[in-house]
Amino acid sequence: MAGGSATTWGYPVALLLLVATLGLGRWLQPDPGLPGLRHSYDCGIKGMQLLVFPRPGQTLRFKVVDEFGNRFDVNNCSICYHWVTSRPQEPAVFSADYRGCHVLEKDGRFHLRVFMEAVLPNGRVDVAQDATLICPKPDPSRTLDSQLAPPAMFSVSTPQTLSFLPTSGHTSQGSGHAFPSPLDPGHSSVHPTPALPSPGPGPTLATLAQPHWGTLEHWDVNKRDYIGTHLSQEQCQVASGHLPCIVRRTSKEACQQAGCCYDNTREVPCYYGNTATVQCFRDGYFVLVVSQEMALTHRITLANIHLAYAPTSCSPTQHTEAFVVFYFPLTHCGTTMQVAGDQLIYENWLVSGIHIQKGPQGSITRDSTFQLHVRCVFNASDFLPIQASIFPPPSPAPMTQPGPLRLELRIAKDETFSSYYGEDDYPIVRLLREPVHVEVRLLQRTDPNLVLLLHQCWGAPSANPFQQPQWPILSDGCPFKGDSYRTQMVALDGATPFQSHYQRFTVATFALLDSGSQRALRGLVYLFCSTSACHTSGLETCSTACSTGTTRQRRSSGHRNDTARPQDIVSSPGPVGFEDSYGQEPTLGPTDSNGNSSLRPLLWAVLLLPAVALVLGFGVFVGLSQTWAQKLWESNRQ
């Protein structure tokens, strides 16, 4: 039976290949004297894709040809809308948008001429030829589709060809379906590609177990269900690992309609057979199932079957010893979609690579390769919108121009920041370590996208922001890490309008020390901040990230060397004075970070105590000596 089928279909296929070789396949004619490259292309909604199958050891290069015959190298270019994807042992894919460079529109069709080169490892060009991509494709009744044009290497060897028996595949209106007519490239859901020559003798045409295509039940129950071609008894003899078929109803009719096997005596009555099964679902999913039996028949490895254009994330959803299953959305995994009249056509490719075994003096393979072109066709008129999305045009870009920024630094009376000191209240007197609540704000601005940024804040002994010594309060917008009393940033409450126009922090009152004598400077401390305004747009968030690490150090006067860079500096209306806990300005001597100055009175007491004891002991000794001397003198007189 299989031999008869192969003989029956051998003559038409051979005739078709001969006609293609003689000249009808005008797009895929190789250069004289050079073997051709196997390739095919597809047309999508927004662009076209060229699929080229190199031989082992070949590297593909693409060039586009303009209307004057000039060739231009192809690289991944977002300006020209050209993209190339190439991986070892897999087809190379060249994609071009209809808006791309050198794509010409003639008579409502898009034309792109592509020059392909297969380069050997030594840099020599092994194969070179042109291909013209035309989208939408011309009428297949007048022009042979490139997917069936045979490469020149057909005449050199006897490759194993994967061919499919024709089946009746026309469904009723409104169903997702596939048309299994391999000799009609315009409607075929499977376009077999010749495999690599396999070792040993074999027939020129090897008949693949017939693939079946199923459809899901209609939404309209009054319409007649399409009854697909049933699998043969041999195809339903699955030895082990029966895989349940995806059907809505478990009836025999629904199972066979889906292209699956049915046996009510089994635990799994509806299961996939020993073939390739394609299912198209109205909820927007592809199901592709390939059996191990089919893989063995055509000398391919089941584990090497994958989606041609898919990323690595589109791996099989289920892989057993007997089957491999791909389940993915129609719009994912490299699926192309095009609109033909009132029909939506989704297409994808299943391909198989080869397993290479490397030896000490060479490499071999025992695998053939094949590709399975799957197609789902839906009637667009049957679909109703389930969601409408409105994308308003982007807001016009803000007009920017240079100008002054009005800023203000003021000191609040308490931590609530509800009232502030006026100019007549300065200088403000604070005890050492007492908190000072500081606010910097942007004035006369109502743009909510403006963000006030604090870069550096510091204290100085005069109204000159650059006078030394200085003490840093904020560094790069974050509390200065060298301060043992870390400055605290204060969040704004929700009632403050334009919160991004404000920055608040609390600093502990301090006294600047003279860098030479390390004694407290008698005077006032003025507060300064360098600021800028940032406009949030796109990826610019205008935020400052501060680390949470702490380092306790003694306050000492710092030195700023930022004066070379222009800055917007804002200062407090007046200075902050300080006094000790007794109401007097302290005159401190040198101290260390452990507060040893507070231990000095105790140290003096400890040192003076032995001296006092020594003086008292000496006095007692002198007194006793005089007493004993007088008593001795009186006793001698008597």
Curated annotation (Swiss-Prot):
Membrane topology value: Single-pass type I membrane protein
Cysteines paired by S-S bonds: 236-261, 245-260, 255-270, 457-478
Propeptide: 554-638
Residues linked to a glycan: 76, 379, 561, 596
Transmembrane segment boundaries: 602-622
Pfam families for this protein: Zona_pellucida, ZP-N, ZP1_ZP4_Ig-like
Extracellular side stretches: 26-601
Ranges for region Disordered: 165-208, 549-594
Cytoplasmic-side positions: 623-638
UniProt keyword list: Cell membrane, Cleavage on pair of basic residues, Disulfide bond, Extracellular matrix, Fertilization, Glycoprotein, Membrane, Secreted, Signal, Transmembrane, Transmembrane helix
PROSITE patterns per UniProt: P_TREFOIL_1, P_TREFOIL_2, ZP_1, ZP_2
Broad class of the protein's primary localization: membrane
Domain ZP, chain residue ranges per copy: 279-553
UniProt subcellular location: Cell membrane
Signal peptide: 1-25
Polar residues biased stretches: 165-175
GO annotation (BP), single: binding of sperm to zona pellucida
Keyword Signal listed: yes
UniProt GO cellular component terms: collagen-containing extracellular matrix; egg coat; extracellular region; plasma membrane
Tissue spec: Expressed in oocytes (at protein level).
This protein's domain notes: The ZP domain is involved in the polymerization of the ZP proteins to form the zona pellucida.
Disease listed for this protein: Oocyte/zygote/embryo maturation arrest 1: An autosomal recessive infertility disorder caused by defective oocyte maturation that results in abnormal eggs lacking a zona pellucida. Affected females have normal menstrual cycles and sex hormone levels, no obstruction in the fallopian tubes or abnormalities of the uterus or adnexa.
Its biological purpose: Component of the zona pellucida, an extracellular matrix surrounding oocytes which mediates sperm binding, induction of the acrosome reaction and prevents post-fertilization polyspermy. The zona pellucida is composed of 3 to 4 glycoproteins, ZP1, ZP2, ZP3, and ZP4. ZP1 ensures the structural integrity of the zona pellucida.
Subunit structure: Polymers of ZP2 and ZP3 organized into long filaments cross-linked by ZP1 homodimers. Interacts with ZP3.
Descriptive protein name: Zona pellucida sperm-binding protein 1
Organism this protein belongs to: Homo sapiens
Gene (name only): ZP1
